[in-house]
Amino acid sequence: MGKSEKEVATHGVRCFSKIKAFLLALTCAYVSKSLSGTYMNSMLTQIERQFGIPTSVVGLINGSFEIGNLLLIIFVSYFGTKLHRPIMIGVGCAVMGLGCFLISIPHFLMGRYEYETTILPTSNLSSNSFVCTENRTQTLKPTQDPTECVKEMKSLMWIYVLVGNIIRGMGETPIMPLGISYIEDFAKSENSPLYIGILETGMTIGPLIGLLLGSSCANIYVDTGSVNTDDLTITPTDTRWVGAWWIGFLVCAGVNILTSIPFFFFPKTLLKEGLQDNGDGTENAKEEKHREKIKEENRGITKDFFLFMKSLSCNPIYMIFILISVIQVNAFINSFTFMPKYLEQQYGKSTAEIVFLMGLYMLPPICLGYLIGGLIMKKFKITVKKAAYIGFWLSLTEYLLSFVSYIMTCDNFPVAGLTTSYEGVQHPLYVENNVLADCNTKCSCLTNTWDPVCGDNGLSYMSACLAGCEKSVGTGTNMVFQNCSCIQSSGNASAVLGLCDKGPECANKLQYFLIISIIGCFIFSLGAIPGYMVLLRCMKSEEKSLGVGLHTFCMRILGGIPAPIYFGALIDRTCLHWGTLKCGEPGACRMYDINSFRRIYLGLPAALRGASFLPALFILILMRKFQFPGDIDSSDTDPAEMKLTAKESKCTNVHRSPTMQNDGERKTKL
């Protein structure tokens, strides 16, 4: 019985001593971290409405993840390789769970969400409520009561979200650089592209789950369980609606903590893949030799750091690759972060529907592209130079295809006084004093409260009062306003709650946009793995962990942090009507000028991506001077060593420590 238990224990240890088991655990970590990140992005609009903050602040919250990552990335990427990498990854996953939990805290500390409305609670219960009354007292004006303004300070609770996202970023830091370097160190070189493709596939499965979770939570009212939803006068398509964003963060917290557990059972080092089948004597000898090498590495931590930094900074392909990545990250982060907001405004759909469509249409082709790209690299043993050309041409093809989305657009919502006149004539610019017209000047209406209604003439109005409606019947979302003096139609001049629908033609354009996105996502992801292998193979083996970390560091500080902030500020400039808080301060934007929004959302990323192809061309030219390991017999070559020209060799002629020389003896092939 004792022998049987010993065999089981030995089998358990062996299971955690294989690179494929680590790959499975790391893939789960990739799923959990991308699940959390995607869910966060899908809920940014809900957070914006919950706290009544502008898009620029939302961009700061989104960029705070990168700030947390930035605080540790260089330290973790270099010093982490000298420590226990699997345990550090496990700790990182647990910290991500803590950050997600902290993000959800404001919901439990704040009161109920109150959306702006012109409908008094009594009028919602009455079948004969007059909303347009001459010389009435405007009881719905923003309050000047100091106690109410103190309550309004609850909007500062978004700082919890900011800090939680920073902590989430700190926890995510060790997963990619340490996980990638661990696989690169102990996997066969020809299997490495496939393994990375599997990891990237995990990074698309996570977003798929995250978007589906976001879609479900966005359909649930934020205060579900504590309010009677039948009394609500808004629906998920309304820009004042706030979904139960906090539920998903609790789910993400639990998933991240569960994902962290397996990493605490993996050893610090593994045998190189393919050596496990050797005899016990050979296996033990190699393991002992590897342990001695690790001890030597730990003696020269800080000394090697500066040597590696100098070597990487003198690597032209590596430095240009960083430049390309920074430019493209600025483009892609902007596009992905604000895609739900753009599609909501462009096509008039709810957050829940948009997020669901993003997950359904865009993520499966990305997942398929990553997987096929990794399989192609493994099957055909594509050299680094060929991989660079494949990545370049596929990226360029997808970039040119993206311009088709410029014609898949819709017009602004027809809102009287904002985008059109009360006669239905479109306005080129927003003029605030046009909100009032002859048909509603005697109604004593509030001009800054957003409570839109749709008239049976096809025009929307900022409120039932501004539509000149004198009477309402029904309750909740079924309320109908009648006797509306501003609505000129052959019917009974009535209106219902909410903006008018943009029509079937606009809905068809959304489908065309999604089809183009499917093709574009597949093409781009197909070339992502070849492109990433260029980054990994242009560095020496001992530099890979630091190189990947430095690459991530530059993308975070020059792209991930500033991009959402300046992009959000530009989007704010396209706002036509801001929500109003209790103390009269502007809240979240209720409606954007979609034409200006479109030019910023599509135009700026297109310009940035276009600029990135110039240094990419320079890399293709520069690579002619290099001999990559995939182009020659790898059995006699350092895995990431490159033959440089005489001039370039001077830059990398640094004094190597014995540790670096020993690491350089490791043999791999592409």
Curated annotation (Swiss-Prot):
Question: Record's InterPro entries?
Answer: Kazal_dom, Kazal_dom_sf, MFS_dom, MFS_trans_sf, OATP
Where is it found, in Gene Ontology cellular component terms?
A: basal plasma membrane; membrane
What does the comment on domains in this protein's record state? A conserved histidine residue in the third TMD (His-107) may play an essential role in the pH sensitivity of SLCO1A4/OATP1A4-mediated substrate transport.
Q: In which tissues is it expressed?
A: Highly expressed in brain and liver. Detected at very low levels in heart and lung.
Give the protein's recorded name: Solute carrier organic anion transporter family member 1A4
Please list the residue ranges that the record places on the Extracellular side of the membrane: 41-59, 112-155, 225-242, 334-353, 406-513, 572-605
Compartments, as annotated in UniProt: Cell membrane
Q: Write down the PANTHER family for this protein, in alphabetical order.
A: ORGANIC ANION TRANSPORTER, SOLUTE CARRIER ORGANIC ANION TRANSPORTER FAMILY MEMBER 1A2
Query: Segment Disordered: which positions?
Result: 649-670
For the modification Phosphoserine, the affected residues are S634, S635
Q: Which Pfam families match?
A: Kazal_2, OATP
